Regions:
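Active-site-adjacent "subsite" loops/lids of carbohydrate-active enzymes
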Residues: 1-2, 58, 75-126
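Glycine-rich, aromatic-flanked loop segments that form ligand/cofactor-binding clefts
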Residues: 21-26, 49-98, 133
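Catalytic domains of carbohydrate-active enzymes, especially glycoside hydrolases
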Residues: 6-32, 123-132, 206-210, 276-284
């Protein structure tokens, strides 16, 4: 599917269904910034790949009254890590910056990395987004023992670094009129600590307006929630995960899961959605290719 066909498909979904929100990449997993920014760091990184501007957002809103979310990837940034090596996590065994499956992580305590991301978030907000959504707002999900950080890698430092960044972002972005959300791993709804990545449910919820746990059935290990193959039980797995979060005190209004829009049939995707809606929750749906079926969604009456 080419870009024009894909965009036409999304426009059809917007006009024919009850979908009212779009999540749009502002800074991607590969470190590219997709709008014209005044950040001095981008002059060094040469990472601008301009795809849209404020006028583009206004054109989208002409389709319908859309709520627009800018997705900004935070601590996974190969361009920043390779350019400013002193801001990246170091691999002492191989004497180089740390990488995990071609992903390069910045040290979450790096002030330069934090300031850079926050400056982009403020600019995206000023351009016309309603909300800034931070993704990869975490430490690497790895037990690799040779990672070297600026600070000792323990629960307190991890959660402090994640929550302090989000708290600073929330304060700055609220002043600009934007709400703030964080994408978190689905298992964080169940795990009572931080999963080794700095995401603790009880503390992170205080630092943002919304959390979007990625409760993808395909990402749960065999046996999770009592199901040998969780991916075969989308409704039950999503429902159980969300129950864990709600039972731990997350307000319904703040719990807005990311649902699985890949590797599933239309019926399975609709089960994901039904599980969230049965708990009176708003939701987002994720497909890395931005390919969505019209039949996932509730159609508007003609």
């Amino acid at each position: 599917m080419n870009k024009e066909t894909k965009m036409n498909s999304i426009k059809e979904i917007l006009t024919k269904t009850n979908v009212n929100t779009l999540v749009i990449d502002a800074k991607t997993d590969n470190g590219h910034v997709l709008f014209d920014t005044q950040s001095s760091e981008t002059d060094i990184l040469k990472n601008e790949r301009i795809k849209y501007d404020a006028a583009t957002l206004e054109e989208l809103r002409k389709i319908k009254d859309l709520y627009l979310i800018a997705r900004i990837v935070v601590f996974q940034d190969p361009l920043f890590a390779k350019t400013f090596k002193e801001e990246a996590i170091f691999d002492s065994k191989n004497n180089r910056i740390y990488s995990q499956n071609e992903q390069y992580f910045l040290d979450p305590s790096s002030q330069r990395a934090r300031d850079y991301t926050l400056s982009l978030a403020v600019e995206a907000c000023q351009m016309g987004f309603n909300e800034i959504q931070f993704d990869y707002i975490r430490y690497p999900d790895s037990t690799y023992q040779y990672m070297v950080f600026k600070e000792k890698n323990n629960y307190l430092n991890r959660t402090n670094n994640i929550n302090s960044f989000l708290g600073e972002a929330k304060e700055a972005l609220h002043k600009e009129g934007c709400l703030v959300s964080a994408d978190i791993f689905g298992f964080i709804l169940t795990n009572t600590e931080d999963g080794g990545i700095g995401q603790n449910l009880e503390t992170i919820i205080e630092s943002v307006d919304f959390i979007s746990p990625m409760v993808y059935p395909s990402h749960y290990s065999n046996g999770s929630f009592g199901y040998q193959y969780p991916n075969n039980h989308p409704y039950e797995v999503v429902s159980a995960a969300l129950n864990d979060g709600l039972e731990r005190g997350v307000p319904e209004i703040q719990l807005r899961p990311f649902l699985q829009g890949f590797w599933h049939s239309i019926a399975d995707v609709k089960e994901n959605i039904e599980a969230a809606e049965d708990k009176n929750l708003d939701w987002l749906i994720w497909n890395i290719l931005s390919t969505y079926e019209l039949d996932y969604f509730t159609k508007l009456e003609s």
